[in-house]
């Protein structure tokens, strides 16, 4: 389904990029490297930090990390990377995963919109930022993701000024993967998939030594 790069020896390989403009890119990189050290995915996979259009051009998949969506958007525009990111995420042959701020950056519509956040507009969802409150209301919750990741229950999902998906604008294309209540009442979507695009409102990269989510991402989206 996805294009591969070829090494000099002729073996196929894929490159997972981690956008390194701002935010938790090191944590994502460390989780990915641990997955590659502990598992065989059947193909050669390389991890690359992405700061320039040249970096991005080498990637088959891209992770947009959690952080600060306004800063991420402004840096991408100021450095000239935004048009390349836009083209990448709208390419159906590329894989994209956005966590927290990455979810905001990928979304088509913001409920509490900021003029400073120029989103990439690829995921047809309506997102509300800081749905659980500010930094002081951040929390970690044990979640059961076994309905889409076999054996992935009791996963420590960390929500930091987390966005949520209030409305799926294209329910035919966008599939809800995980829902949870906000303030004990309204149920909102915290993870969705649209073919080659995955988003989570929480931070799997902050789950210490638990790499199950990243392992599933590699198997489901990159190595298949």
Curated annotation (Swiss-Prot):
Binding positions (L-glutamine): 67-69, 129, 160-161
GO-annotated molecular function: glutaminase activity; pyridoxal 5'-phosphate synthase (glutamine hydrolysing) activity
A Gene Ontology term for the protein's cellular component: cytoplasm
GO annotation (BP), single: vitamin B6 biosynthetic process
Cystine connections: none
Lyase in keyword set: yes
Family classification: Belongs to the glutaminase PdxT/SNO family.
NCBIfam families membership: PLP_synth_Pdx2
Job of this protein: Catalyzes the hydrolysis of glutamine to glutamate and ammonia as part of the biosynthesis of pyridoxal 5'-phosphate. The resulting ammonia molecule is channeled to the active site of a SNZ isoform.
This protein's name: Pyridoxal 5'-phosphate synthase subunit SNO1
Lineage: Eukaryota, Fungi, Dikarya, Ascomycota, Saccharomycotina
């Amino acid at each position: 389904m996805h294009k591969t790069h070829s090494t000099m020896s002729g073996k196929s390989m894929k490159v997972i990029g981690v956008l390194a403009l701002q935010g938790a890119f090191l944590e994502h990189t460390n989780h990915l490297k641990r997955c590659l050290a502990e598992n065989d995915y059947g193909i050669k996979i390389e991890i690359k930090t992405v700061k320039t259009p040249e970096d991005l051009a080498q990637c088959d998949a891209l992770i947009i990390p959690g952080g600060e969506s306004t800063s991420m958007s402004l840096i991408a525009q100021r450095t000239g990377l935004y048009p390349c990111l836009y083209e990448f995420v709208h390419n159906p042959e590329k894989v994209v995963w956005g966590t927290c701020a990455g979810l905001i950056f990928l979304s088509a519509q913001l409920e509490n919109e900021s003029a400073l956040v120029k989103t990439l507009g690829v995921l047809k969802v309506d997102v509300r930022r800081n749905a659980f409150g500010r930094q002081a209301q951040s929390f970690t919750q044990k979640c059961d993701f076994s309905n889409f990741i076999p054996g992935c229950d009791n996963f420590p999902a960390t929500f930091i000024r987390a966005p949520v998906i209030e409305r799926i604008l294209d329910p035919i294309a966008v599939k809800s993967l995980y829902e949870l209540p906000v303030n004990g009442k309204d149920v909102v979507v915290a993870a969705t998939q649209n073919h080659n695009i995955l988003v989570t409102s929480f931070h799997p990269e902050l789950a210490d030594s638990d790499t199950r989510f990243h392992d599933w991402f590699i198997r489901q989206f990159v190595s298949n």
